[in-house]
From Swiss-Prot:
Reaction catalyzed: S-(5-deoxy-D-ribos-5-yl)-L-homocysteine = (S)-4,5-dihydroxypentane-2,3-dione + L-homocysteine
Record's protein name: S-ribosylhomocysteine lyase
Organism the protein comes from: Psychromonas ingrahamii (strain DSM 17664 / CCUG 51855 / 37)
Pfam families: LuxS
Gene Ontology biological process terms in this record: quorum sensing
Annotated HAMAP family: LuxS
UniProt function note: Involved in the synthesis of autoinducer 2 (AI-2) which is secreted by bacteria and is used to communicate both the cell density and the metabolic potential of the environment. The regulation of gene expression in response to changes in cell density is called quorum sensing. Catalyzes the transformation of S-ribosylhomocysteine (RHC) to homocysteine (HC) and 4,5-dihydroxy-2,3-pentadione (DPD).
Keyword Disulfide bond: no
EC number per UniProt: 4.4.1.21
One annotated GO molecular function: iron ion binding
Length: 169
């Protein structure tokens, strides 16, 4: 089985909250696709609550688009990681980590401004596979933790596992 890019970095030395450019690629029409690792919590130390991450999934994707989309950037998708330590964001374009971090913080402030659970987009049985599994309070706790900590960066050059390390694992 091929080794996925996300498993070539050392999760024991990742910082969080932090932005990492996980991958860039070119489409046949020469558009740049960038995949970001938006790490909310330190791997293997903490994880996002299931209701909190689900509510963030509904809110964060829209708020990030409000703050990051531009004539040069278009978010394709923002999806939670299975390990519940963050989200992956795929987009057309190549914004800097600083631009992404600033949009992330603005999106977290937007989460804090949501007053009622009923304001969560697509919160119904027709548009959500587990519409009862939400918590605005838990999403706000996550958002406040990100704001309080600030958003840094993880650089691949600093956290990539060597070929020798990968062989030993």
């Amino acid at each position: 089985m091929p080794l996925l890019d996300s498993f070539t970095v050392d999760h024991t030395i990742m910082n969080a909250p932090a932005v990492r450019i996980a991958k860039t690629m070119q489409t046949p029409s020469k558009d740049t696709i960038t995949v970001f690792d938006l790490r909310f919590t330190v791997p293997n130390e903490d994880l996002l609550s299931e209701k909190g991450i689900h509510t963030l999934e509904h809110l964060y994707a829209g708020f990030m688009r409000n703050h990051l989309n531009s004539p040069d950037v278009e978010i394709i998708d923002i999806s939670p990681m299975g390990c519940r330590t963050g989200f992956y964001m795929s987009l057309i374009g190549s914004p800097s980590e600083t631009e992404v971090a600033n949009a992330w913080l603005a999106a977290m402030r937007d989460v804090l401004a949501v007053e009622h659970q009923e304001e969560i987009p697509e919160l119904n049985k027709y548009q959500c596979g587990t519409y009862a599994m939400h918590s605005l309070a838990e999403a706000k706790t996550i958002a406040q933790a990100v704001i309080d900590a600030g958003v840094g960066t993880n650089k691949n050059a600093d956290i990539t596992l060597s070929d020798e390390q990968l062989k030993q694992l």
